[in-house]
């Protein structure tokens, strides 16, 4: 279906090497055959409680992204997401703290914050055009997913350097009294 849409909307005949999908809990409720090569849940918060009877119901919907046998990319800072880890499953973690050997996280060196893979610094946080811990966490998740897919590091870092964020997100509206 996506190939047809690409052909009709964008006049693209070649099949893409991969698809990047952002799926809501609503969409995941009706997803039965997804077997993503890599998937992540960035965090869990009590959203959409008008739709779900309990937080556990919401978590169960989000957990559906991990059906299949692909790499799980999980937020080590969120205990609910960490509880989704399946024994024996290939997984990468990301954290705003210092990462373990094969995980992604932040390293503090020389007075600077670095996005890192294990002990290896990949990109300085100051090189990014986005701000906020949530954006650093998202960038770490993206790097972990790209790494799991075997994407070239320089391509991923170039994309992060160029990314300006979404319109109206973390935009200064007014400064008052200082």
What do these predicted regions represent?
Residues 17-25:
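Switch II (G3) loop of P-loop NTPases
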Residues 3-16, 36-37, 41-178:
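Acidic, Mg2+-coordinating active-site environments of NTP-dependent enzymes
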Residues 28:
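Carbohydrate-associated surface elements
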Residues 31-35:
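ATP-dependent NMP and nucleoside kinases share a basic, alpha-helical "lid"
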Residues 1-2, 25:
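Acidic, glycine-rich active-site loops and adjacent beta-strand->loop/helix elements
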């Amino acid at each position: 279906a996506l190939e047809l849409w690409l052909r009709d909307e964008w006049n693209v005949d070649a099949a893409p090497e991969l698809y990047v999908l952002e799926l809501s809990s609503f969409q995941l409720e009706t997803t039965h055959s997804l077997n993503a090569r890599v998937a992540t849940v960035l965090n869990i918060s009590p959203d959409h409680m008008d739709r779900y009877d309990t937080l556990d119901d919401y978590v169960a919907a989000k957990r559906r992204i991990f059906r299949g046998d692909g790499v799980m990319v999980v937020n080590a800072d969120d205990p609910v997401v960490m509880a989704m880890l399946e024994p024996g499953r290939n997984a990468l973690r990301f954290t705003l703290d210092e990462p373990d050997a094969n995980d992604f996280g932040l390293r503090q060196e020389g007075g600077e914050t670095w996005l890192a893979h294990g002990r290896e610094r990949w990109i300085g946080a100051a090189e990014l055009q986005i701000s906020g811990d949530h954006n650093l966490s998202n960038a770490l998740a993206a790097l972990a997913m790209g790494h799991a897919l075997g994407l070239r590091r320089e391509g991923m870092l170039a994309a992060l350097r160029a990314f300006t964020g979404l319109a109206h997100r973390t935009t200064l509206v007014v400064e008052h009294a200082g």
